[in-house]
UniProtKB/Swiss-Prot annotation:
Pathway: Porphyrin-containing compound metabolism; protoporphyrin-IX biosynthesis; 5-aminolevulinate from L-glutamyl-tRNA(Glu): step 2/2. Its EC number is 5.4.3.8. It catalyses: (S)-4-amino-5-oxopentanoate = 5-aminolevulinate. The gene is hemL. The lineage of its organism: Bacteria, Pseudomonadati, Pseudomonadota, Betaproteobacteria, Rhodocyclales. This is Glutamate-1-semialdehyde 2,1-aminomutase. GO terms for cellular component: cytoplasm. Pfam families: Aminotran_3 (PF00202). GO terms for molecular function: glutamate-1-semialdehyde 2,1-aminomutase activity; pyridoxal phosphate binding; transaminase activity. Homodimer. It comes from Azoarcus sp. (strain BH72). It is found in: Cytoplasm.
Length: 424
């Protein structure tokens, strides 16, 4: 008998390329039929067949308070009643900018956009306009959205589909993108010594989350800061995923590094489409209408998205919020690691704040090459066994996972118990 998930996927493929609107959702990496989600609440989602899952995807990061949090839903309802979009400034977007500037000391001015891709694309253009240089440095396996110049040896969906770069990206774009190994500061230093006067920016996920979770080695981020300062390049932290997810000031707060520009998304939209980029005042003053670097958007600063984002951020400001979130993630990775040891399965796991990574390898990877060496077939088997048991992990070995404030210890222990059965 055909399930509703299967029927919907078949139907979707007739009108949507691959049946999905973002490639990783297609389950191509793990095989099988994607789950079509009909509703979500707290730490759970329900698919088209009515099956419930404890959710560790969390809309790929935004659902930090859990799904359908009453405060966020009410904020969206109230904003929608006042009007969905105006194409004009609003007080709420000023409030959002002021809040983000207050929460992240590196941000002196900020511009709201409609997605993380828009944020990183605009930050790169701004860095080029500010410096008068063309070249950028990025790192293999780090994903910064689907802008052309950033789709060279990127992570996330490109890794899932086994492609180092996207088709349709002109060679000239790739020519201005220098791709180096994440966590290899010597490579960065060599490039700066050879062509430092041509480098406009270094863009990095300060904690990588799109080749699974990879933390920076000691001194790596500090070295990037030093080199960018020395050569006059703009240091861009892509905190679309990590911003307000790993701590109250993102990775930059945890590691004490001040970037020149920061890109944000996900949590700051509370589940609605939103992005932002901001940083030093002298750089941000180059953006139109103040300066020559153009950026615009019909729905930038959407009043409904901003309302959701403000509600989401206010929830994270509760005392002990991030300590509790980190404890939940640590409980999960410790539990999964323990049952894998019991089963004799090569496995490792790590977490930071409300993010976690699981790897079918004997040690936690520190580089793209080490991630690629993990046992992806073992991950695929684990994914499907856990899915069948009602636990929804990211459908790719190259994606980080997320816990929310709605995950209770009982949820975590239920997942660990299911993993014990699946790994036998």
């Amino acid at each position: 008998m055909t399930s509703r998930n299967e029927a919907l996927f078949s139907r979707a493929q007739r009108s949507i390329p691959g049946g999905v609107n973002s490639p990783v959702r297609a389950f191509r990496s793990v095989g099988g039929t994607p789950r079509f989600i009909e509703r979500a609440e707290g730490a759970r989602v329900w698919d088209a067949d009515g099956k419930a899952y404890i959710d560790y995807v969390g809309s790929w990061g935004p659902a930090i308070a859990g799904h359908s949090h009453p405060a966020i839903v009410e904020a969206v309802r109230e904003a929608a009643l006042r009007g969905l979009s105006f194409g004009a400034p609003t007080e709420s977007e000023v409030e959002m900018a002021e809040l983000l500037c207050a929460l992240l000391p590196s941000i002196e001015m900020l511009r709201l956009v409609s997605s993380g891709t828009e944020a990183t694309m605009s930050a790169i253009r701004l860095a080029r306009g500010f410096t008068g240089r063309d070249d950028i440095i990025k790192f293999e396996g780090c994903y910064h959205g689907h802008a052309d110049s950033l789709l060279v040896k990127a992570g996330s969906g490109l890794l899932t589909f086994g492609n180092p770069s996207s088709g349709g990206v002109p060679a000239d774009f790739a020519h201005h993108t220098v791709v180096l190994d994440y966590n290899d500061l010597d490579q960065v230093e060599t490039v700066f010594k050879a062509r430092g006067d041509q480098i406009a920016a270094v863009i990095v996920e300060p904690v990588a989350g799109n080749m699974n979770l990879i933390k920076p080695r000691p001194g790596f981020l500090e070295g990037l800061r030093r080199l960018c300062t020395e050569y006059g390049a703009v240091l861009i932290f892509d905190e679309v995923m990590t911003g307000f997810r790993v701590g109250p000031q993102g990775v930059q707060g945890l590691y004490g590094i001040t970037p020149d520009l920061t890109t944000l998304g996900k949590v700051i939209g509370g589940g609605m489409p939103v992005g932002a980029f901001g940083g030093r005042r002298d750089i941000m003053n180059c953006i139109a209408p103040l300066g020559p670097v153009y950026q615009a958007g019909t729905l930038s600063g959407s009043p409904v998205a901003v309302a959701a984002g403000l509600a989401s951020l206010r929830l994270t400001q509760a005392p002990g919020f991030y300590d509790a979130l980190a404890a939940r993630a640590r409980s999960l990775v410790d539990g999964l690691s323990g049952v894998a040891r019991e089963a004799g399965v090569p496995f490792s796991a790590d977490s930071i704040g409300g993010m976690f990574g699981i790897y079918f390898s004997p040690s936690v990877p520190a580089s793209f090459a080490e991630v690629m060496a993990s046992d992806r077939e073992a991950f695929n088997r684990f994914f499907h066994a856990m899915l069948d048991a009602g636990h929804y992990f990211a459908p790719s070995a190259f994606e980080a996972g997320f816990v929310s404030a709605a995950h209770g210890e009982a949820d975590i222990q239920a997942t660990v118990a299911a993993a014990r059965a699946c790994l036998r």
